[in-house]
Amino acid sequence: MAMQKLFTYIYEFIEYRKMVLLEEKVPYDKFVQMVFNTGFFRINAETLNHGIVSVFIFGANGKYVHHGGDMRTLLTNTLNEKKQYEELILIVDKPILGKKNILDIIVEQRAANPTVVINIYPYHLFCINIPKVSAIPKHKLITQEEAQEFLGREYLQPQDLMQISASDPPVVWLGGRPGDFVQIERPSETAMHAVVIRFITKSKI
């Protein structure tokens, strides 16, 4: 069931982020075959800024999430390709996020490739279309100029704002980065919506 949802919603995620697929969407059976037989399924897409984003969905029992050397080789070879990489998104079964050898490789690859955003997330972030969940308030990234205008009007500094992690599900779907600002519309008893601004901070992983 998780794989079926991942297959459905990862493409909705790419569309929501306004990315363009660089290959045709594959049938579900091929997706499953790749995840379980090869160990991962890869989607390549292009951003509005013409940067390349590669999404890797790893099988829960594949060699890449259990053997650090295989993960290191995969990421190194990917980033050595002659492409203008903007982001790598690694999607894994939640227990993998507790494996130190895998997380150490993520840290290592970030240090070696400072211009590329490399993030690792659990399956469940992509097993539902987060922006369509009615219980979650509307989130929207705002520009630095809009944020500075708000801060100036309220006589605030960025550190005065409440924070939100870059790994928060709505922020992940928006593509928010540490240092960005997100506007959240919450229901209000005195108005249609109460608008709050949050400062995005680095995630723990």
UniProtKB/Swiss-Prot annotation:
Pfam annotation, one family: RNA_pol_Rpb5_C
| Keyword Transcription included in the entry's annotation | yes
GO CC terms, sorted:
DNA-directed RNA polymerase complex; host cell cytoplasm; virion component
Going by the UniProt record, its keywords in alphabetical order are: DNA-directed RNA polymerase, Host cytoplasm, Transcription, Viral transcription, Virion
The record's subcellular location field reads: Host cytoplasm; Virion
Question: Its domain of life?
Answer: Viruses
Q: Which GO terms describe its biological process?
A: transcription by RNA polymerase II; transcription elongation by RNA polymerase I; tRNA transcription by RNA polymerase III; viral transcription
Position of the signal peptide? none
Which InterPro entries does the UniProt record give?
Answer: Arch_Rpo5/euc_Rpb5, RNA_pol_subH/Rpb5_C, RPB5-like_sf
GO MF, one term, reads: DNA-directed RNA polymerase activity
The UniProt family comment states: Belongs to the archaeal RpoH/eukaryotic RPB5 RNA polymerase subunit family.
Role this protein plays:
Component of the DNA-directed RNA polymerase (RNAP) that catalyzes the transcription in the cytoplasm of viral DNA into RNA using the four ribonucleoside triphosphates as substrates.
Instruction: Describe the protein's quaternary organization and the partners it interacts with.
Output: Part of the viral DNA-directed RNA polymerase that consists of 8 polII-like subunits (RPB1, RPB2, RPB3, RPB5, RPB6, RPB7, RPB9, RPB10), a capping enzyme and a termination factor.
Please identify the protein, giving its name as recorded: DNA-directed RNA polymerase RPB5 homolog
Which organism encodes this protein?
African swine fever virus (isolate Tick/Malawi/Lil 20-1/1983)
